[in-house]
């Protein structure tokens, strides 16, 4: 995995992402940390985790995340709900592709340390959102859209919407 940090973020946010990277590298020793301005150093077949709303690679790789996200003006749409990036932090995993792609966006620099601590406990989910206080407001599996166990009889692909369930334990 390559954790790609945003070079265009404000200084305080860049420092918070550097702390995030250090924490995760202690937990995951094989994690490579790279700056989004040094994309030539990233192999074409690399698994990527993009950090920060201002990450330069979001423009290039973000298309794969569009299967689970949408936009409503400036807000992100996840599971039919709107989340603004000024008061919500999100973590997303692309539901398909030969190589893994993830994105972590923080509401602000102060939210990043708690994401470093919390996200490893939510690794089975493909979509997460946290409010400004750090409380989890969405945890959902990413839809499976490209599986050998799936066959589409038409060109149009539709996603199955499962009913919302309340967790047995919070």
Predicted regions, residues:
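Solvent-exposed alpha-helical segments and adjacent loops
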Residues: 1-170
